[in-house]
């Protein structure tokens, strides 16, 4: 986490470079990561990996019908969760973001309830497994069609900007999303209207 006094200025004349041509570190700022904060980030990443492993067991034992493995995504997901303000900012996730959901504060009981379509699921089992959402945390319910959440994310971000709410919209997606029309529609809408 970069300290507030060391944030980057967007749209500078020179490109912002943190790594040199030979791979050397060029960044001249301290990170605000020490002690308990580092332990909390590590715990959240470990919990995300363990959740992913449990989901894999559920599919292999036939207890659920769909999973989207996310091993290796933990650091990015936990970083997003700790960089935003849960319940104020908005997250538009894709189906591999169960670690992000957990780190934001969606209870394990709800995540497993959603995965197994039990009464612990806020949607009462009416949503496909691995598609959680949380109204309280502004965690947009995951949609199955790849990239279909990008246009709503762009629209939400533009409305936040116009209304000057101070909120942020975060949209995550995999590389396959960039081959979809919805992705291009959302990116174009954000570029033209944003």
For the regions a language model picked out, list residue spans one by one.
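Charged, compositionally biased N-terminal leader segments and the immediate start
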Residues: 1-30
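Alpha-helical protein-protein interaction elements
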Residues: 3, 10, 33-34, 47, ...
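N-terminal glycine-rich anion-binding loops that anchor highly charged ligand groups
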Residues: 10-11, 16-21, 43-57
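Asp/Glu-centered strand-loop micro-motifs enriched in Gly/Pro and often flanked by an aromatic residue
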Residues: 30-32, 65
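Positively charged, low-complexity intrinsically disordered leader regions
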Residues: 36, 40-41
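Cofactor-binding active-site loop characterized by glycine-rich and histidine/acidic residues
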Residues: 50-53, 57-193
